[in-house]
Amino acid sequence: MSTTSSFQSNADGTRITTYTWAETPGQPVGVVQISHGLAEHGERYDRFARALNAAGFIVHAVDHRGHGRTAGDNLGDFGSAGFSGLIADVAQFGALLRAQHGPQLPLFLFGHSMGSFAAQAAIIDHSSTWSGVILSGSTALDLFAAAMANAPADAPAGLAAFNAGFEHRTGYEWLSRDAAEVDAYVADPWCGWDVPPDVIPSLFAPAPRLADPAQLARIRSDLPILIASGDADPLAAGGVLLEQLGQRYRDAGVADVAVKLYPAARHEILNETNRDEVTGDVAAWLRAHTGLA
């Protein structure tokens, strides 16, 4: 079970709902901060968080601005600070967690999809906050944005565009091969809502900075980065965009960058048919980067 709290965003005063899973066997070995994706919410990570608890990690998540309990009846409204405020919230929450848990416990940032874009931005300015970063369902945002801009005029808009290459039972088959997981997403009132037309462009706005070698060079060279996705994820372009993203970090001087692709897996690798494999791999990577085997 998670416990719920909140903090006030320094960006514009928005109250950000937080969740904590802290039932570790024995003393914790580390802390994981989760930054979720667009049109979902923090409590969807309950199964993953409990698995990380079993591996010795305390887990914290949020409902980002415009999402879940943070948004209430205003889903999709990112507030006056917009997506830049969401990025600032990720950094602020990381600093709060670092202060709460102290220097003795390593703090890792796990960002999925939109949350991974925020993580990519946050580590440019605040890489000293975290002991390692995992980017799930991510992409080289500038290249992906360019591909989206070149889509045919009659192509589906919003999240529906990502389902073009998949069967169309619900319109969200691009998320997972597991029909039960897709159905749970569709049934969740805090998931899959209509994305306001200004949101997608706002997510793409940081793209030039995320591709700028001078900006990436600000990331500390000893920050471990794991990029993990399904190779059938539309954002991955068969893995090509993830390899390019990983190479950018290497070229910027980051020494420990790994790219892990799961064959045939789709966007939400934590909710895929091979989710136990993915969760085990993530837990093993985390433990390895705490100095534990």
Each PLM stretch: what is its role?
Residues 1-25:
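N-terminal cap/lid segment of alpha/beta-hydrolase-fold proteins
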Residues 44, 49-75:
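Conserved alpha/beta-hydrolase
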Residues 79-99:
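Alpha/beta-hydrolase active-site loop
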Residues 101-113:
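Alpha/beta-hydrolase fold nucleophile elbow
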Residues 110, 116-195:
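Alpha/beta-hydrolase-fold enzymes
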Residues 227-229:
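Short beta-strand/loop motif that positions the catalytic acidic residue
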Residues 231-261:
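Conserved loop-alpha-helix segment in the C-terminal half of the alpha/beta-hydrolase fold
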Residues 252, 256-293:
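Catalytic active-site module of serine/aspartate enzymes centered on a nucleophile-bearing elbow/loop
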